[in-house]
Amino acid sequence: MVILFSEEVKLVAENDDAVTSGHVENPEEEQMELSLRPQTLDQYLGQKRVKKEMSIYIKAARQRDEALDHVLLYGPPGLGKTTLAFVIANELGVHLKSTSGPAIEKAGDLVALLSDLDPGDVLFIDEIHRLAKPVEEVLYSAMEDYYIDIVIGEGQTTHAVHVPLPPFTLIGATTLAGQLSAPLRDRFGIVEHMQYYTVDELEKIVQRSSDVFHTSIAPEAAHELARRSRGTPRVANRLLKRVRDFAEVKGEKTISLATTSDALKQLQVDSEGLDQTDRKLLRTMIEGYNGGPVGIRTLAANIGEDMETIESLYEPYLLQNGFILLTPRGRMVTDKAYLQLGLPIPNDN
């Protein structure tokens, strides 16, 4: 494909206000994640199947002295996709360049990134489903045959240049794998689905993070916090920071179960890890639409969230834990949702 060079890539940060959001909220939280980030697969907690498979692929690539095949990581936000990309690069002993789909505004931005890679390096693109179509098309030849075609010069001096690229590994991360085009998806040789973490796995993460934060947490408090963290390490670490604040104000040297429960109540995180937006979504379906079915566009308009946020951030957890069902006609709440909200279950439900 022939494209034009453009200016430098602009990095974009996105914010989310919900304490149980799986998204990174601000630069401070991004720095916190860096401090907690494991360096090796052995240090990486959870995702046992993914770790086992990636360990084999990495060892094989190193033995052949080849670039690792391109990797697609998909699943809800906050499950460690970015962290795993850094771990993979570290295990390979190569450099990693990180960007996101929305940050690559023009095809030339991607060309600049690709041209700066050394043999075997990793290019990590978060939110890869949000790449613009012209940018995505540049990736096809780059991923498959390690080359790009660019146009340089102006007017009569314009000419096309074939630019070979060193063998590299593209790691793409997405919360919405279904939005990837088939041509792009088919070029990933390794596709890994990131699963929600178990309470035991999150408990270990909470204990490890408390050590990094130079604080102490009682085992039963760590368990309760893990239980309400939506199966998501990022949520667990965020809640731990807030609970730590409550404990410090109370003068506790070790975070207790009582303080943890009080703090989570203050933060409006209920016994199942549901937050205000979760409950608003469920109540809207129940009180406005008799429990559903309700279309995603209607839901988004009613609760003031965009459709992508609902689909990537809220629905996966509500589905996984049996609060809603997806039907051909839309979303429906389950009996469990009525019980969690303290509402009577309709006779015909």
Swiss-Prot record:
Region ranges (Head domain (RuvB-H)): 271-349
Binding site for Mg(2+): 82
Top EC class of this enzyme: hydrolase
Catalyzed reactions per annotation: ATP + H2O = ADP + phosphate + H(+)
CDD domains for this protein: AAA (cd00009)
Protein name in UniProt: Holliday junction branch migration complex subunit RuvB
Gene: ruvB
Alphabetized UniProt keyword annotations: ATP-binding, Cytoplasm, DNA damage, DNA recombination, DNA repair, DNA-binding, Hydrolase, Nucleotide-binding
UniProt-listed Pfam families: AAA_lid_4 (PF17864), RuvB_C (PF05491), RuvB_N (PF05496)
Top-level taxonomic group: Bacteria
InterPro entries named in the record: AAA+_ATPase, AAA_lid_4, DNA_helicase_Holl-junc_RuvB, P-loop_NTPase, RuvB-like_N, RuvB_C, WH-like_DNA-bd_sf, WH_DNA-bd_sf
The record's note on its domains: Has 3 domains, the large (RuvB-L) and small ATPase (RuvB-S) domains and the C-terminal head (RuvB-H) domain. The head domain binds DNA, while the ATPase domains jointly bind ATP, ADP or are empty depending on the state of the subunit in the translocation cycle. During a single DNA translocation step the structure of each domain remains the same, but their relative positions change.
Renumbered residue ranges of the record's region Small ATPAse domain (RuvB-S): 198-268
Location of this chain's protein in the cell: Cytoplasm
Keyword ATP-binding among UniProt keywords: yes
Function: The RuvA-RuvB-RuvC complex processes Holliday junction (HJ) DNA during genetic recombination and DNA repair, while the RuvA-RuvB complex plays an important role in the rescue of blocked DNA replication forks via replication fork reversal (RFR). RuvA specifically binds to HJ cruciform DNA, conferring on it an open structure. The RuvB hexamer acts as an ATP-dependent pump, pulling dsDNA into and through the RuvAB complex. RuvB forms 2 homohexamers on either side of HJ DNA bound by 1 or 2 RuvA tetramers; 4 subunits per hexamer contact DNA at a time.
Molecular-function GO terms, alphabetical: ATP binding; ATP hydrolysis activity; four-way junction DNA binding; four-way junction helicase activity
Binding sites annotated in the UniProt record for DNA: 331
E.C. number(s) listed in UniProt: 3.6.4.-
SMART domains in the record: AAA
Oligomeric and partner information: Homohexamer. Forms an RuvA(8)-RuvB(12)-Holliday junction (HJ) complex. HJ DNA is sandwiched between 2 RuvA tetramers; dsDNA enters through RuvA and exits via RuvB. An RuvB hexamer assembles on each DNA strand where it exits the tetramer. Each RuvB hexamer is contacted by two RuvA subunits (via domain III) on 2 adjacent RuvB subunits; this complex drives branch migration. In the full resolvosome a probable DNA-RuvA(4)-RuvB(12)-RuvC(2) complex forms which resolves the HJ.
Cited NCBIfam families: PRK00080.1, ruvB
Chain residues that bind ATP: 36-37, 78, 81-83, 144-146, 187, 197, 234
Family note: Belongs to the RuvB family.
GO CC field: cytoplasm; Holliday junction resolvase complex
A GO BP entry: DNA recombination
